[in-house]
Amino acid sequence: MRRPVGRRIFIKINGVQFMTNKSNKYLITSALPYVNGELHLGHLIGCLLPSDIYARFCRARGRDVLYVCGADEHGTPVVVGAAADGMSIQDYANKWYEKHLRAVRDFNLSCDLYGRTHTERQEKLIHELFARLDAQGLIEERETLQPYSATDNMFLADRQLLGTCPKCGYENARGDQCDKCGATYEADELINPRSAISGACDVEMRPTKNLFFMASRVQDVWRKWLKSHAPKWSKTASAIANGWASDELRDTSITRDLPWGIPVNKPGYENKVFYVWFDAPWG
């Protein structure tokens, strides 16, 4: 990360003099773990510890730091987990959030806030964001074919659906992404789909309306922004972003037929929620 330009101040910590920058603020976060299981060393090493170390380093340099993280409470992992445990989704989320919070304290992580995404504040934020995007012509309604299980009597979204990855052939890929090769795709691209809830293979594609974020309409602006900002990032982050920029941005569905999540604030969509990847990054 490039050092910000600002007023330089020298401080001493344990007799060692450091040059710092008091005029800049640092917001530090990390990926939000799902509330569908215990936090473990994998979360600590791959997700939470790097951000915690950087937050501590910045504070030691006298920087103005806000370090936030929290639990990702929405999406199909939570819905599927609650059903498997025979619990209400809210009780299931509460159970694991409290366990996560205790683990964060036990690990002595220095978060200023370890929050959660199923809150009134989060709902208000997402509703405001959606309204702004809609007003700018970046939201479009489309009727698409989505997987429906006759056995479960419901549409299957994301992790409620399993099948063979269309990219690498992995046989236990999720409905929206493959955990083996990292590919993302639409549900109708999944090969030999089956329900993750009942295991039923009677999955058929039925029409349903969803709202799409029109990423294709902002790709030129995004590429221009990326060109000026990516050089400031780590080589890994820059390479990943530039890899995305080499392809066309794909318009993406941001609503789901699920009983849990941030409700969609648009007439006709009262029974749908926002896709977790539209909701959680703002948490």
Task: Indicate residue ranges for each PLM-predicted region.
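Glycine-rich, flexible loop/turn motifs
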Residues: I28, V35-G37, S110, A135, ...
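N-terminal Rossmann-like or analogous alpha/beta NTP/dinucleotide-binding catalytic cores
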Residues: T20-T29, Y34-R142, M154, P166
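Intrinsic disorder/low-complexity segments
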Residues: M1-Q17
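Structured secondary-structure scaffolds
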Residues: T20-G62, L66-C69, R121-K124, C168, ...
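Residues on a specific face of well-ordered alpha-helices
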Residues: T76, E98, D176-D179, F213, ...
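Residue-level signal for inorganic ion chemistry
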Residues: L133, C178, D279
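Cys/His-rich short segments
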Residues: G137-N210
